Regions:
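N-terminal alpha/beta PP-like core and its mobile active-site loop of ThDP/TPP-dependent enzymes
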Residues: 1-217, 256, 263, 344-347, ...
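Glycine/aspartate-rich loop-and-adjacent alpha/beta segment that forms the canonical ThDP
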Residues: 8, 52-75, 282, 381, ...
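Gly-rich Lys/Arg/Thr-decorated short loops/hinges at beta-loop-alpha junctions or inter-strand turns
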Residues: 9-13, 56-68, 129-130, 230-241, ...
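Short glycine-rich anion-binding loops that position phosphate/pyrophosphate groups of nucleotides
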Residues: 50-51, 98-100, 124, 161-164, ...
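A general structural motif
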Residues: 68-81, 100, 139-142, 247-249, ...
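Thiamine diphosphate
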Residues: 94, 146, 152-155, 160-164, ...
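Active-site diphosphate/adenylate-binding microenvironment
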Residues: 229-315
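Acidic, Ser/Thr-rich peripheral helices and adjacent loops at domain boundaries
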Residues: 360-377
Length: 429
């Protein structure tokens, strides 16, 4: 069994690999794995031979000190060039990615000094929620108002973002603008888009350095935010309801769910056609409370990661959105695990009775989509039979009533949205 090169398999995923060598070195090997995870800032797989499992060893607590130092400070001609571009910009914009989450306060100070709006990549969703000029997600998931602002901007200062094709909309959003990229990881700079200036440095320290020089040179604020209507920056239009009878409108459902769930929550999304509307319309309080499970483009990972999130933070509700295909693949067999653990978990199944990503492709090619459709069992009934509470809804009124009835429920719950496969919005990617 498992007679493959496990080290090479793990390395191919981007994770690190640490081998437990002998029973005598177990505590050191485990400590080494924890050390590497902190220093390398990536998952480390600890590989232990099965025949070690029942051997008795003397436990000796081993902790390796992690030597940390502030990240690099920007300097030299590259810094001068970047500051010159920022100082001369009429409509600057600050973009933060997952690599700049810890720099939140410094980025806000810089944005306020420049009078520049703030935006995030998908993985940094929620970072600037409370700021009046928060544009939310930058890229193909932007609101119409945010798209207009991006179009008007002349300088985009990017912190902790690799600027991949979804963020830049295949590069179109960055055309005719000066792009400054700040990242501590060399591989993140210029990988997808070549910037006009690049600073291999810590995001927070760089923002503070730029701010200091702007003040030192008495550079006037841009005034860009004075042109903006802060009320519209994060508003996505609802659109026309074309949903067939017997089904619930998906976008309207999300608007109801956004208002109904506690704001201090953990948001998890599985993969599928449904997910991009969730990313746009369902908020998370901060990036650490937002879990995207489709990193490999694979569906069926959502419930497993939701269980982990609920165990890690039992004092907050976890809300997980999944499609019907993803729930059948990896959710239905784990729902009872959530029940047995008594987790504070609500699962929303966007059930369009189809593999939605394929359904739209068949329609686009004027082919019969019936091959992509399925007559699933009732997910609500299955959830109830597994020890939870399941409710299927086909109207907004039924959804609102279901949410009221679930208030105070002490077991995992599931709300099945019965959707029209012909009226689920296209993925915004």
């Amino acid at each position: 069994l498992q007679s493959i090169d496990q080290r090479e398999l793990v390395k191919a995923t981007g994770a690190g690999f640490e081998q437990v060598r002998t029973t005598e070195t177990i505590t050191k090997d485990v400590a080494r794995a924890y050390y590497r995870a902190q220093v390398e800032r990536r998952p480390i797989v600890l590989n232990m031979p099965a025949d070690f499992m029942w051997q008795e060893v003397e436990h000796v607590a081993t902790v390796l000190d992690v030597f940390t130092a502030p990240g690099g400070v920007a300097e030299g001609n590259a810094l001068d060039d970047a500051i010159g571009m920022i100082a001369s910009a009429r409509r600057p914009l600050i973009l933060a990615g997952a690599g700049a989450v810890s720099a939140k306060d410094s980025l806000i100070k810089l944005a306020d000094r420049l009078e520049a709006p703030l935006a995030t990549t998908l993985k940094a969703k929620g970072l600037f929620n409370d700021h009046p000029y928060n544009m939310d997600i930058f890229g193909t998931l932007s609101t119409p108002a945010a798209y207009d602002i991006i179009a008007k901007s002349d300088c985009i200062v990017c912190f902790g973002s690799a600027l991949h094709s979804f963020t830049t909309d295949q590069g179109k959003l960055m055309r005719n603008k000066r792009v400054i990229q700040v990242d501590i990881e060399p591989s993140a700079i210029g990988g997808s888009l070549h910037p006009d200036a690049a600073l291999l440095a810590d995001a927070s320290l760089t923002a503070e350095t730029i701010l200091w020089w702007l003040n030192e040179a008495e550079i006037a604020p841009s005034g860009f935010t004075k042109e903006l209507d802060s009320e519209t920056l994060t508003v996505h239009p609802i659109g026309t309801n074309k949903t067939a009878t017997g089904c619930i409108n998906y976008v309207q459902s999300l608007e109801v769910l956004e208002s109904a769930f506690p704001k201090d929550r953990i948001l998890v999304t599985d993969g599928g056609r449904f997910m991009t509307e969730v990313w746009c319309r369902i908020s998370a309080p901060d990036p650490q409370s937002f879990i995207v499970t489709a990193n490999f483009g694979a569906i069926g990972q959502g419930l497993q990661e939701s269980i982990g999130a609920a165990i890690a933070d039992p004092d907050r509700p976890v809300v997980m959105f999944t499609g019907d295909g993803g729930f059948m693949m990896g959710g239905i067999n784990e729902f009872n695990t959530a029940v047995r653990l008594g987790l504070n978990l609500t699962v929303i199944v966007a059930n369009d009775s189809a593999y939605g990503a394929e359904h739209i492709q068949f329609l686009d090619r004027k082919m019969d989509p019936s091959l992509t459709t399925f007559d699933w069992p009732s997910f609500a009934e299955v959830a109830t039979s597994l020890g939870g509470v399941g409710i299927q809804v086909t109207t907004i009124e039924e959804l609102e009533a279901a949410l009221v009835s679930l208030d105070g429920v002490k077991v995992p719950s599931l709300v099945e949205l019965k959707l029209d496969p012909n009226d689920v919005p296209r993925m915004r990617i």
